[in-house]
Regions:
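Transmembrane helical cores of multi-pass ion-transport proteins
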Residues: 1-426, 494, 506, 526-527
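Conserved SAM-binding loop
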Residues: 77, 511, 536
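Generic hydrophobic alpha-helical segments
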Residues: 88, 169, 463-467, 543, ...
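Active-site donor-binding loop signature of nucleotide-sugar glycosyltransferases
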Residues: 234, 453, 539
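Short secondary-structure capping/turn micro-motifs that flank functional sites
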Residues: 332, 518-519, 538
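The feature marks cytosolic C-terminal regulatory regions of anion transporters and related permeases
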Residues: 363-530, 548-551, 555, 563
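Short acidic-hydrophobic, aromatic-tinged amphipathic segments that line or gate anion-handling sites
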Residues: 530-546
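Extracytoplasmic
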Residues: 543, 562-563
Length: 563
């Protein structure tokens, strides 16, 4: 069993004691391999996000190193991913590049707080229809942003809005570049063939080097990184603190939450994939802290938001990575490219990168999940469809917010269907099931009701059935809570209101059998003041005994009855 200190140590530190030359060689091979795979992806994500390609490489170097060095996963690879493309585009369009840097740092702080407070496990509570909906939507948007480069269209500006973007593309189809289209579709075909038949061969590397060589050798008339961006500078930029704009901090909080939640979801999903492939078990809280530190640091070097990258992580594991050192070597490999081979990168054709991103969009789309979603309830289908639609036509922040609200209402509705408030009748006592009331006759002066399931907001109205015909109730009403699995403030208030109604009619309410969570919460809320501590019993036998004591005393006439 790990010590409390070890629970907060990065995997890189925990695995150092068993590190050796054999593991280093394996990490070196895997790190260089995944570094070469990451190069075209980092540039493609940056260009798709509306920033120069070096921003993606800087992000991959800085965050890739920090996430591996400080994270809670053995083989996780961090860096820019397709999930952030749409968000980054929207933030830059609204707040500019400094707004993006500020938003990324805010998201980093939120991720650190989530890790420190132990919220790493909270990601599992995101409903599947919401996750599938926004990944479907992001995939559609990424593909739509790459149509211009895939077909070599001459467009000065690509609108940020989906429908305006598609309209502008349709208007400029006459500018299609046949050579660029061929390069783009050949690149996409190579990616598909590698994924289908040559799973151990990184298609992105073949496409990047092959297309670059073809453009250089045959002088193909296609747009390249150099013709659009003027090449990539050698070396890392100087550390620069972004210009913080205090008046925008409140406006940036909402997109920062989106970046943080999206980063947390993707990084922990990626870590789970890594665990399944490597047989390891990641530490979600340490992983979130590392993700946060990486996102706080990335903007200082002009980098993008980052998270765990599922495809690169899988490549890392398949390439034989043994420890987080492989992830650090991946970052150093990218640094070596920037330092010694930056001039060569300018010849990479944008059509080839578009082909790579089309494949990325397809892979991240979770398309196989759609038939499964369609088998679920109408509410789940509505949550998925609305999240997908809003992601495409509005923005990801709104899509996730609306999706989560609808999913919450769906959850409440499903919970309400499982909670019952029913009277314990003779049929219940004699139905043959083993329970404490078996073979015991309930006196006529007692009515026993049981609450079965969670008694939370949204279901508390069911208790009103008890008092629908209050005049017909006997003098004593016992509420049995043995099968009530949970309660909240609304549930306690409903029980208090029931007690008040019964007391006003001259009746006595007893409660019994509360489980630890409901009992503790009811005690903290001062529930005893409403029914009397002597009327809260541990079990039904005590409640029946207490009822007999009350019945044996002279009592005034019950309201609503006649003598």
């Amino acid at each position: 069993m790990s010590s409390p200190i070890e629970a907060w140590l990065p995997k890189s530190v925990l695995l150092l004691r068993e590190y050796n030359a054999e593991k280093f060689v394996a990490d070196l091979i895997a790190g260089v391999t995944v570094g070469l795979v990451a190069l075209p992806l980092a540039m493609a994500f940056a260009i798709a996000s509306g920033v120069p390609p070096q921003a993606g490489i800087y992000c991959a170097i800085v965050t890739g190193f920090l996430i591996s060095a400080l994270g809670g996963s053995k083989t996780q690879i961090g860096g820019p991913t397709g999930a952030f493309v749409v968000v980054v585009l929207g933030i830059i369009a609204r707040y500019g590049i400094d707004g993006l840097f500020t938003c990324t740092m805010l998201a980093g702080v939120l991720l650190v707080v989530m890790g420190i407070t132990g919220l790493g496990g909270m990601v599992k509570f995101f409903p599947r229809p919401v996750v599938v909906g926004f990944t479907n939507g992001i995939a559609v948007l990424i593909a739509s942003t790459q149509i211009r480069d895939l077909f070599g269209l001459r467009m000065e500006h690509v609108p940020g809005d989906f429908f305006h973007r598609m309209g502008a593309i349709a208007e400029n189809l006459h500018t299609l570049n046949g050579v660029a289209t061929a390069v783009g579709f050949i690149s996409l075909s190579v990616m598909i063939l590698c994924a289908k038949f040559l799973k151990r061969v990184p298609g992105a590397i073949l496409v990047c080097f092959g297309a670059t060589a073809a453009v250089a050798i045959f002088h193909l008339p296609v747009e390249t990184i150099g013709t659009r961006f003027g090449g990539i500078p050698s070396g890392l930029p100087h550390i620069a603190i972004p210009r913080l704009q205090p008046q925008l901090l409140l406006h940036l909080l909402s997109p920062a939450v989106t970046v943080a939640m999206l980063g947390a979801i993707e990084s922990l999903f990626s870590a789970v994939v890594s665990d399944r492939m490597s047989g390891d078990k990641h530490n979600p809280n340490v992983e979130l802290i590392a993700q946060g530190v990486a996102n706080i640091t990335s903007p200082l070097f002009g980098g993008l938001p980052a998270t765990g990258a599922i495809a690169r992580t899988a490549t890392n594991v398949r390439s034989g990575a043994k420890t987080p050192v492989a992830g650090m070597i991946h970052a150093l490999t990218l640094l070596a490219v920037i330092l010694f081979a930056a001039p060569l990168v300018k010849n990479v054709p944008l059509a080839a990168l578009a082909g790579i991103l089309f494949m990325v969009a397809y892979n991240m789309g979770d398309w196989a999940e759609i038939p499964e979603i369609l088998k679920l309830s109408k509410m789940d289908i509505s949550v998925w469809l609305l999240t997908l639609t809003l992601t495409v036509v509005a923005d990801l922040t709104l899509a996730v917010e609306v999706g989560m609200i609808l999913a919450a209402f769906s959850f409440i509705r499903k919970i309400s269907m499982t909670t019952t408030v029913s009277k314990v009748t003779d049929e219940y006592i004699e139905d043959g099931r083993a329970h404490i009331l078996q073979d015991k006759a309930i006196p006529e002066y007692i009515a026993v009701y049981r609450i079965h399931g969670p008694f939370l907001f949204g279901v508390t109205d069911k208790i009103a059935e008890i008092t629908e015909d209050i005049a017909s109730l006997p003098p004593i009403v016992i509420i049995r809570l043995r099968n009530m699995t949970a309660i909240d403030a609304t549930g306690i208030a409903a029980l208090e209101e029931l007690a008040a109604q019964l007391q006003a009619s001259g009746r006595t309410m007893l409660v019994c059998g509360a489980r630890p969570q409901p009992a503790a919460l009811m005690h903290e809320a001062g529930f005893e003041r409403h029914v009397g501590g002597e009327n809260i019993c541990e079990n039904i036998n005590q409640a029946l005994k207490r009822a007999a004591e009350i019945h044996s005393r002279p009592v005034p006439a019950i309201a609503g009855t006649s003598c």
